[in-house]
Amino acid sequence: MSKIKKIISREIIDSRGYPTIESEVHLQNGSIGLASIPSGASTGSREALELRDNDPLRYFGKGVKTAVSIVNTSISSAIYNQDAYDQENIDKIMINLDGTKNKSKIGANSILSVSIATAKAAAQSKKIPLYQYISELHGIKEELLMPLPMMNIINGGKHADNNIDIQEFMIQPIKANTIKEAIQIGAEVFYTLGLILKRRGFNTTVGDEGGYAPNLKSNESAFLILSEAVSQSGYMLGKDITFCIDCAASELYNSKTKTYKLTSEQKKFTSYEFTNYLSALVDKYPITSIEDGLDESDWNGFKYQTKKLGKKIQLVGDDLFVTNTNILKKGIQNNIANTILIKLNQIGTLTETLNAIKLAQNSNYNTVISHRSGETEDTTISDLAVGTNSGQIKTGSVCRSERTAKYNQLIRIEEKLGAKTKIFKNFYFNI
């Protein structure tokens, strides 16, 4: 009864208006799983391939009709009548059908849409929430924790049309004891920041991830104005709220000169100088997490950065690790970073994603479940964060419904888990 009866795929649009893929998996017992796939703007070169049509006459080449057709034909035939409860087997069949290292033949977006939809159909068939089904797949025995959010309230880099180089300035409400409280704190700081920006004549339009995108004098100006917003909201920096940043340093890196350029400040740095620049910011502000603080290929630089900052704060690998267990193993062996960002579409199946999370957790690396800048209303990452006890989640600001959908799902999950449910507090950083 839990066998796959039918798969239907279609082209929909994401939060940037670009096409993406949505797939339904139907089981013989009537259960249905629905999943849609996000897309990134700043992407790691080693990510699994997102299949696009490249037809310039349609959606500027960004259509996904080819991916949809592959799901409706090749993938549908390959997994027809397979047991949806055997997630690993379903994913393995699709990986083998593709046959490439980066899923470039049939596309990570095609495969992932079916992988997630299968898990959702299986959860519905078992009459349990998706987070509970994921926890069973992941082998979680302990109580489930709510993830503490990193809330992106100033956007820069490739996520906004402004002059800020650092891609994300986030707040983490460490005071919060529930997800509801965390969201309230984030929302109040977000409102206050908007009022401050408006009073000072700055634009209060938002970027791809829902954060404000003002033109500021420098990257440090963002920390100063964020500090004001926190204080004016009635919270204490370092005690109630800390800062997290995503440098997306691969976007700042010149591979020919091996330097990092902050255009807003007209400064260039070697990898060692850029680490020292970040270290000075950590000393000055309560920054507790830095993501992609160097280019994905700058492993010698990352060794120095980890040695200098790895005992103080989270050093998160996004483009660095691309949710890939082979690359993460290398990072662990070489003491590179101490945290991995988890993005389902970087690797292309739920099984491989769970393997990356498990490897990180078994190696004492923190995990952060993440959205992408081009999102949909799909809330799978909320269930993934809870079901794996990841502890942290990045899903943008408290603005734009494709972002708030994930927060609202976390509220529902917390409600289902009950009043005794705890939020992640396993910090090791120094403030």
UniProtKB/Swiss-Prot annotation:
Active site feature: 209, 343
An individual GO BP term: glycolytic process
Organism: Buchnera aphidicola subsp. Baizongia pistaciae (strain Bp)
The protein, known as: Enolase
Protein keywords: Cytoplasm, Glycolysis, Lyase, Magnesium, Metal-binding, Secreted
SUPFAM superfamilies, per the entry: Enolase C-terminal domain-like, Enolase N-terminal domain-like
Function: Catalyzes the reversible conversion of 2-phosphoglycerate (2-PG) into phosphoenolpyruvate (PEP). It is essential for the degradation of carbohydrates via glycolysis.
Gene symbol of the encoding locus: eno
Residues annotated as binding (2R)-2-phosphoglycerate: 167, 343, 372-373, 394
